[in-house]
Amino acid sequence: MILLYITCKDNTEAKKIAKNLLNKKLIACANIFPIESFYNWKGKLTQDKEVVLILKALDKNYKKIQEEVKKLHSYDIPFIGKINVKVNKEYETWAKNK
């Protein structure tokens, strides 16, 4: 299984992406957390309130998930991080049957 870590501009955007992926059965679950981000953008130190969207999915769906996120995301360059994880058998079985 994989976890995808995606930063979004707000709850509305994160929920839109999560619901789209759930409806297409590309993910098993989504978690949304408020965060504060610091980064350099166009030569300027920037501080923003954002939202992290964590997606739990099967690795075989990664490419399709990435394509959908890019279509729905408002950022010019969205961060879509993929983390391979080992999970308990029961959860993986549940996720495969979604």
PLM segments and residue spans:
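Positively charged, small/polar-rich N-terminal and surface patches that mediate targeting and assembly
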Residues: M1-K98
